[in-house]
């Protein structure tokens, strides 16, 4: 008999991301002004009771509104991609963090903002492997004003 998923797996979980590593599922989510990860050996045991892996210092361009974090294992390390701003939505940008101990549930430190040169609003980024290369895909505005939202892709 095949197990079924219990729905909802968790309540109040906007922008969920789950990855499997070493026979465990890791669920990454925004929580209390930071990014948290919980893990379980079975996906239907995941809960929002995880460890905070990154909490930004106050007063930074990435201190507020951390949205849609994702963790990816790339080039021998764990990276977290998350949208954040300084409290003004127009300043939402994508940031990359790196695990300090090489584990998906380790502490993460800021690497920097992902910058395509436009300075435009950017959220909901993900990594896309395609044709032996990596691409970054995100949703963003076409200008500094919210006139039109598009999906963008760029080689990493």
Region spans (language model):
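Carbohydrate-active catalytic/glycan-binding domains of CAZyme proteins
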Residues: 1-156
């Amino acid at each position: 008999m095949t197990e079924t998923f219990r729905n909802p797996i968790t309540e109040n979980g906007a922008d969920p991301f789950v990855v499997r590593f070493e026979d465990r599922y890791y669920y990454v989510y925004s929580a209390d002004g930071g990014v948290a990860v919980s893990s379980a050996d079975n996906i239907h045991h995941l809960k929002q009771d995880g460890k905070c892996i990154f909490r930004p210092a106050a007063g930074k361009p990435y201190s507020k509104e951390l949205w849609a974090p994702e963790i990816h294992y790339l080039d021998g390390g764990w990276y977290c991609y998350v949208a954040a701003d300084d409290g003004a939505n127009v300043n939402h940008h994508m940031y990359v963090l790196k695990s300090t101990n090489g584990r998906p549930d380790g502490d993460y430190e800021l690497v920097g903002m992902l910058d395509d040169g436009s300075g435009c609003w950017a959220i909901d980024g993900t990594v896309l492997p395609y044709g032996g290369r990596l691409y970054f895909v995100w949703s963003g505005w076409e200008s500094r004003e919210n006139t039109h939202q598009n999906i963008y892709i760029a080689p990493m």
